[in-house]
Amino acid sequence: MFNLKNRNFLTLMDFTPKEINYFLDLARDLKRAKYTGTEVQRMKGKNIALIFEKASTRTRCAFEVGAKDQGAHVTYLGPTGSHIGKKESAADTARVLGRMYDGIEYRGFGQEIVETLAEYAGVPVWNGLTDEDHPTQILADFLTIREHFNKPLSEIKFAYVGDGANNMANALMIGAVKMGMDFRIVSPKEIPTDATLVAKCKEIAAETGAKVTITDNIEEGVKGCDVLYTDVWVSMGEPDSVWESKIKLLTPYRVDMNMIKMTGNPDAKFMHCLPAFHDEETAVGKEIKEKYGLSEMEVSHELFESKYSIVFDEAENRMHTIKAVMVATLGDQ
């Protein structure tokens, strides 16, 4: 057993492999308890603030449902629902909310904001996504891999394909090296992964037995992989010029049936943190089609809907793993 009471959850860098496994074991147990109707509420009477400077489906729902299941109450502060960073500093916001709430979730921009909240709040602070990291997503990903593969995480070969400079590439690399995985980032050289973070992760890999490979060679990068993972190529709000250049660079890196076959692994799985641009059924999808002539972006519709895709198991596990983080750091032991 581990006592993680009152710990912040800002990045997986802050946790040992054993502690990460504890979160995953607890998430598995909470999932079973929910399915069997035997869940015990360990956060009765707790009040949780959810600060969302960026919109969300999965993260918000996971925190709200997870908290409700465990007997806690939540207050949602949306993009226009708080003064943080506009009329009030993150430090002042933290000291106010820390007087009223037992835990605070933050989803927004710079990692330094969630770190400031954690420094001043005096209660557990959880990172629901920043520009640099997305640790709750990684717990969901690793729980999903555990469920689909009959081997430990340390034996998993994993390739992240696409934008090697985004927060998912960072977060997956941190989690993968902690757990001793063979991890590859397959991305154009023009979109480099943060060199300082790569160096730090390689240091950790030397201790855990993990491997880190950064390559622009798709065939080499995906060979033998158990999991191919991708994320959106561009973020909402980025200028058209960025969209155009990134789409041009990343189109050869679209994950499709051919790439899954390149792994040489008939049991390979496809993962994505969602939302995914795999068809024209959204306003953004239609806009991409009109501007760039693409019916699909980072993943082909065929692969997204295929037997290889486990994206909705992964999405469900956001709730079970986020619940585990809250229970471990805030729940009655």
UniProtKB/Swiss-Prot annotation:
Alphabetized SUPFAM superfamilies for the sequence: Aspartate/ornithine carbamoyltransferase
Annotated binding of carbamoyl phosphate, by residue: 56-59, 107, 134-137, 273-274, 318
Keyword Cytoplasm: yes
Subcellular location as annotated: Cytoplasm
GO molecular function, one term: amino acid binding
Pathway assigned to this chain's UniProt record: Amino-acid degradation; L-arginine degradation via ADI pathway; carbamoyl phosphate from L-arginine: step 2/2
GO cellular component, one term: cytoplasm
EC number(s) given by UniProt: 2.1.3.3
Keywords: Arginine metabolism, Cytoplasm, Transferase
Binding site for L-ornithine: 167, 231, 235-236
Enzyme class: transferase
Pfam family, one: OTCace_N
Catalytic activity from the UniProt record: carbamoyl phosphate + L-ornithine = L-citrulline + phosphate + H(+)
A Gene Ontology biological process term: arginine biosynthetic process via ornithine
Domain of life according to the entry: Bacteria
Similarity section: Belongs to the aspartate/ornithine carbamoyltransferase superfamily. OTCase family.
Cited function: Reversibly catalyzes the transfer of the carbamoyl group from carbamoyl phosphate (CP) to the N(epsilon) atom of ornithine (ORN) to produce L-citrulline.
Protein name per its UniProtKB record: Ornithine carbamoyltransferase
Species of origin: Clostridium botulinum (strain Langeland / NCTC 10281 / Type F)
Source organism phylogeny: Bacteria, Bacillati, Bacillota, Clostridia, Eubacteriales
Gene name of this polypeptide: arcB
